[in-house]
Structure formats: structure tokens, C-alpha cells
Amino acid sequence: MNRKTLFTRYLHNLTEVARRGDAREESFYASLEDLLAQVAQATGRAHVHVTTLPKSTEAGNPDFRLWNGTDSIIGYIEAKNPAQENLDHIEASEQLHRYRWTFPNLILTNFLEFRLYRHGELVDSVLGARPYVLNQLRAAPPLENADKLWDLLERALAESK
């Protein structure tokens, strides 16, 4: 499956969840977990496992853990509800500050925008689709920046060697 098709399917899945009208943040987790697994597979990293709601860490409870399935943590993901259209406020929060400086490879996302941090510093940010279209119009948002989003996710997974 090519990148555009993969991301378009992901956006369609998010839209289906959003249209129900009763979705919480956790309702979107399966779509992201599936996307991450497919990107890992497509980039030759089939050994990467995605754990949703992993056990607590010294810094708190991020929503996802990426790991090799045995002994090596690749990174963590903190997800926020797609209704949280501006991640700047989250980025400045005490919670994310803790995560950024504890986890050397971290993604912050509202399922549409993805921000990659390495050792606490923002190294990449990609808007894959407009939250307004999903949240207000309840329509599948058009895919934007597919190649850049692919590169960000591949870069995050690259820690898996």
C-alpha cells in the first residue's frame, strides 16, 4: 500500500470515529496504533510493537510505547483528542515537559498533527490534515504533507535499528 493510500485510510478511520459524536481521546487509539504498525511494516521494522496505554513510567503515563517486543524501548507517544486543535498549549504543559526530558524519542499528536522531540527538543512537526474539517465539519480532512508525515514517523521508528 502506498503512503497516500495508507494515510487516507487512516484519516477515513478517524472520521468514522469522530462522526459517532460520542468519542473520547481513547476512541481514536486503534486508528493510530494501526497506522504505526503499517508504517513500521512498510519501512522494514516489522519487529516494532505498539503498546496502547502501557504501564506507568517514572515520568507518568504516555498513551503509547514503541518497542522491539523484548528489551528495547524505541519511544513514546502522547496523544490528545483531535478536538485539541492547537498543540502549543500542550507542548508548554508540565506533563509534556516531563515527558520531553525523560524520553529521548517522543511524539506529541492530536492524531492530525505530529511533533517529534529528541532529547527534549522539537526536531520536526507535520500537519497531516486540518483538525477543523474533522472536528467542525465532521468530514474526512484532505491529506496534507504525506511525504513529510511519512518521514517524521519513519524517523521516530528509526531508533529501532
Show where each model-derived region lies.
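Charged, often low-complexity linker/regulatory segments
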Residues: 1-42, 51-53, 158
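N-terminal start-of-chain detector that recognizes signal peptides
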Residues: 22, 34-39, 48, 77-80, ...
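Generic alpha-helix structural propensity
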Residues: 23, 27, 31, 59-61, ...
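Secondary-structure boundary/capping signal
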Residues: 40, 44-47, 107
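Short, solvent-exposed secondary-structure boundary motifs
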Residues: 41-42, 53-57, 94-99
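Active-site metal-binding core of divalent-cation-utilizing nuclease and nuclease-like domains
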Residues: 44-71
